[in-house]
């Protein structure tokens, strides 16, 4: 398995090596409270428009935010956020503390596993939902997830708007 992972790492084309003309986005990690509040406002806007949810103070915030790493994709020229997700690494015995554990009974199935990455609150601005922005966001997560966090498993919750509730 390690051999396959090393082969994958060698053949992976980093999104940072793309031609500048192909990339209209800038990827980064939230590293201060001002940026955290900016992504919380972005999340609130996306979720309120899509699901009709209202947020106190216009911020989608919870206790998980302070223990997570926050990935942001911005439009290169304006600096506006176009896509976002948050990450938290758990060991199996900690999985009951995850956001997913609030929504699903994950403890019996995941508590024995090492290095579980929870991804959540992912959202993309409606003008950028063609797939390119989300692809760029995920591609930029790969180095962190594989090399820094060394995640072995990935889990998370997703909210999807369905037309006519089908």
Protein language model features and the residues they cover:
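Acyl-donor-binding surface of acyltransferase catalytic domains
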Residues: 1-15, 54, 92
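Short amphipathic alpha-helix that is part of the acyltransferase structural core
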Residues: 14-82
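Carboxylate/His-rich catalytic cores and anion/metal-binding grooves
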Residues: 79-89, 96
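Core nucleotidyl-transferase/polymerase catalytic module
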Residues: 63-66, 88, 104
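Acyl-donor binding region in acyl/amide transferases
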Residues: 90-166
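Polyanionic, low-complexity segments and short acidic motifs
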Residues: 2, 19-23, 159
């Amino acid at each position: 398995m390690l051999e396959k992972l090393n082969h994958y790492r060698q053949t992976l084309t980093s999104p940072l090596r793309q031609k500048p003309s192909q990339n209209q986005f800038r990827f980064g990690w939230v590293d201060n409270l001002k940026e955290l509040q900016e992504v919380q406002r972005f999340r609130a806007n996306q979720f309120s428009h899509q699901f009709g949810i209202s947020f106190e103070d216009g911020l989608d915030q919870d206790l998980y935010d302070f223990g997570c790493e926050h990935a942001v994709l911005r439009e290169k020229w304006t600096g506006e956020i176009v896509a976002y997700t948050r990450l938290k690494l758990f060991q199996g015995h900690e999985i009951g503390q995850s956001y997913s554990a609030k929504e699903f009974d994950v403890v019996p199935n995941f508590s024995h596993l090492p290095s579980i990455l929870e991804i959540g609150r992912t959202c993309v601005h409606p003008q950028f939902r063609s797939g390119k922005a989300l692809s760029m966001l995920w591609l930029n997560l790969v180095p962190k997830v594989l090399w820094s966090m060394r995640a072995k498993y990935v889990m998370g919750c997703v909210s999807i708007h369905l037309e006519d509730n089908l």
